[in-house]
């Protein structure tokens, strides 16, 4: 069920089959949750045909949520369902609480996490932060939005992934490192930020990944990522159609920030939408308001 603070847990060679697991917060096929200052390691464990549902936050095929998490050689083919966008929060929560977040084929959410050589083939759905491997590492949205770091290596997803926003074939939203991983499932966001590998990241490094299926969003859709504000892409390939019903669609990224390096990437699929479309990137550049000093600096530079 839960790992207490300052406790180290290792789960190895365990499996759950043909069950139904329902809960409110941190619901997983193998482990529910790991609290702050806990460390969890799960290896060679599998969820087979078990349906996992969290009505509030963090549903995962292997683990619902863990503070510090290491997963190796695990798999899920059960159906994972996170909270719906219409789920109302309890009335006594602080104003800065986050809710209706996190659904993943392996992990719903985490603090610092590393997920290696794991795969998902089950359908994953939720509201915000939905991914084939991990859903969301969102920490807070007030006064600013912050994420924890996750690394995904040698992983794959073949299940369909859908939700409202921040939807990805491997990761919904996080500060992400991804290496030698791929997605074969259809990715769909009812609202914004959908990507074959990643929905959204303020910072990401994605190398040697591939997307093979369709990516659809109302806005911000990309064959690899819906949006990345800063980071690098190298040796990535998209072969899935990318569509935005409104704006920002690209073979690699729907919209990128001011600081991005991209090398040896390729797109072989059609891009469609109403505005800001690109074979590689829909648009590059952060939105900003020009101050008087910015104008003066530009004048002197000119």
Name every feature range the model reports, one short phrase each.
Residues 1-302:
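Predominantly extracellular beta-rich ligand-binding scaffolds that present long acidic/polar faces
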């Amino acid at each position: 069920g839960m790992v207490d603070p300052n406790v180290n847990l290792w789960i190895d060679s365990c499996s759950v089959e043909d069950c139904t697991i329902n809960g409110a917060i941190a619901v997983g096929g193998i482990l529910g949750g790991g609290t702050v200052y806990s460390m969890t390691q799960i290896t060679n464990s599998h969820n087979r045909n078990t349906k996992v549902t969290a009505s509030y936050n963090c549903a995962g095929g292997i683990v619902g949520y863990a503070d510090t998490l290491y997963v190796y050689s695990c798999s899920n083919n059960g159906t994972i369902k996170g909270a719906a966008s219409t789920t109302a929060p309890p009335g006594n929560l602080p104003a800065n609480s986050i809710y209706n977040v996190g659904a993943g084929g392996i992990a719903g959410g985490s603090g610092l996490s590393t997920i290696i050589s794991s795969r998902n083939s089950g359908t994953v759905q939720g509201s915000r932060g939905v991914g084939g491997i991990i859903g969301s590492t969102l920490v807070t949205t007030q006064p600013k939005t912050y994420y924890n770091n996750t690394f995904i290596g040698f992983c794959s997803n073949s299940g369909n992934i859908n939700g409202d926003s921040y939807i990805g074939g491997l990761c919904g939203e996080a500060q992400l490192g991804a290496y030698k991983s791929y997605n074969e499932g259809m990715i769909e966001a009812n609202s914004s930020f959908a990507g074959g590998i990643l929905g959204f990241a303020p910072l990401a490094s994605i190398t040697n990944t591939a997307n093979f299926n369709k990516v659809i969003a109302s806005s911000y859709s990309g064959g690899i990522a819906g949006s990345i504000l800063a980071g690098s892409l190298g040796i990535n390939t998209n072969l899935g159609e990318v569509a935005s019903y409104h704006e920002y669609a690209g073979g690699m990224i729907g919209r990128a920030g001011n600081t991005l390096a991209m090398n040896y990437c390729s797109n072989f699929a059609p891009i469609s939408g109403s505005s800001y479309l690109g074979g590689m990137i829909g648009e590059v550049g952060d939105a900003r308001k020009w101050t008087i000093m910015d104008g003066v600096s530009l004048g002197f530079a000119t």
